[in-house]
Amino acid sequence: MIKFITQFLFVGFIALGANAWADDTVRDAAISAVVTDQIDAFSKDDSERAFSHASPMVKASIRSHERFLTMVKNAYGMIYRPSSHELQEVRMIEDKLYQVVLFIDQDRNRFKIFYQMQKQANGEWKINGVTTFTAKNDVFA
């Protein structure tokens, strides 16, 4: 009987772990889709679509999709018109989720961008800001 209970608990823990992994996979795919769509929107100068992925805090501070596009053009050229980009992992840092993306700009400079993601009450993921790092040693596949 004890062996059965132990096996039952073991199988239950494995199932819980598999469910958590599956939930993370679904979450990460949703986050990646948001970031990818915003990058695509920038490539087409679709400021409304790009701005639609911004969190309420970002929208409140910038106030319009036109201003948002201008800000990205001027401050984040590597995101606005990258030579290439590659989505990396989704990371949890201090209870916040980040989509990591490697970018190469038009001058061949490399950047690692951390997109801070924020889950909304309706379940959608929004971008709550980015943090940029120079990524001299990162290699693109």
What are these model-predicted stretches?
Residues 1-2:
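N-terminal secretory signal peptides that target proteins for export/translocation
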Residues 7-17:
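Bacterial N-terminal signal peptides
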Residues 11, 20, 39, 57:
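Generic anion/oxyanion-binding catalytic loop in active/binding sites
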Residues 20-32:
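Cleaved targeting-peptide boundary
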Residues 29-33, 37, 47-95:
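Short solvent-exposed beta->alpha transition segments
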Residues 89-141:
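Exposed beta-sheet edge and beta->alpha loop/turn motif
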